């Protein structure tokens, strides 16, 4: 088997916001990059591209090479992954492989994995066992698809799929806990008992960091703040130390790329100024709250007031989002629950004997869990909603890096344990039993 010393496993976690990859045994992932990709459809060819192609074909026929198969090129799209996204390109759409926490486009995931292995970690995947973190809500079909890609395309020697909630639990040294994972695309609450997710306890909500960022953006827009994406202007020096912002005219920029760049700025505003209010947000009470200033990339300074408290409070009270102009409400807003309700519902779906233990170790993880005061407020509200004399303890790592990467860190710990080495689903087993065997090897 894969003894710990001679070959290190790779741990990879593709979330809806970012992809984390690195070596098992490390304390943080080596590569972290966005999980969205830029895509340019290469069908409608521009005249320039056509001329280039014709010239190429002519030179190829001189050199005796065959011209490229045109049919193949008709539907091709070129994907830009990782740092390539930072550069604006004409007609580049930004697309995500995930919808509601599950993968919908495997081609993009494949490109993300490939980028992580070949460009960031600089490894040959054929030489390393892979531990892949998967959502607690993953279906059997999704798992088989991931396993098939890994064995058939990357020819990995061994594979293990571990659930996000279990890994978060391991990251804080527990085998039983209630994991509240608030990531970019969604928030998932799941009970973990003795290292297994109790599927009946899993509760999900579409409110994650990206939704809060959108609320922040729409709220600022409604107050007349214009967020200029970084690519859309340049600063021109008009005097010593004085700059004038000049807008650049880039008509072929897609809406999705513009939105992606504006979200990046709104997200930074959210991370810089927001904190969860101690009690439920109330427009009147927070009307005169002191503002915090934030400087946008183009130099204008904005003042953020009540929104600092209102935006994070959407996690606790989703209906608040409907008071922000321009935010699309959820199709069924009644079914979207706040965090404390999700926690109580999840615990109540578990066996009576373990409820006490779950409530006394509620773990926070995911990027959105780093909002200030979230831990204290959640503890207070769950305590109010739970019955009488239960002890409620919300645990969260003191530093936000550990909260953000807790799934990856749990994977790093798990894959480097000596006792874990017999758990791998090996290539030999895959060839003997087929892909469906993953359901038995990785419960």
UniProtKB/Swiss-Prot annotation:
Q: Can you say where in the cell this protein is located?
A: Nucleus; Cytoplasm
Signal peptide start-end: none
Which Gene Ontology terms of cellular component type are present?
A: cytoplasm; NuA4 histone acetyltransferase complex; SWI/SNF complex
Which keywords does this Swiss-Prot/TrEMBL entry list?
Chromatin regulator, Cytoplasm, Developmental protein, Nucleus
Keyword flag Nucleus: yes
Primary location recorded for the protein, binned into one broad class: nucleus
- Composition bias, kind Basic and acidic residues: at what positions? 47-56
Recorded hits in SMART domains, A to Z, give: ACTIN
Q: Which CDD domains match?
A: ASKHA_NBD_Arp4_ACTL6-like
Ranges for region Disordered = 36-69
Q: GO MF annotations for this entry?
A: chromatin binding
Q: Does the keyword Coiled coil apply?
A: no
Query: Taxonomically, which superkingdom?
Result: Eukaryota
Its GO biological process terms? Answer: chromatin remodeling; regulation of transcription by RNA polymerase II
Q: Which InterPro entries match?
A: Actin, ATPase_NBD
What's the family?
Belongs to the actin family. ARP4 subfamily.
Primary role: Involved in several developmental processes including organization of plant organs, flowering time, anther development, flower senescence and fertility, probably by regulating the chromatin structure.
Q: What is this protein called?
A: Actin-related protein 4
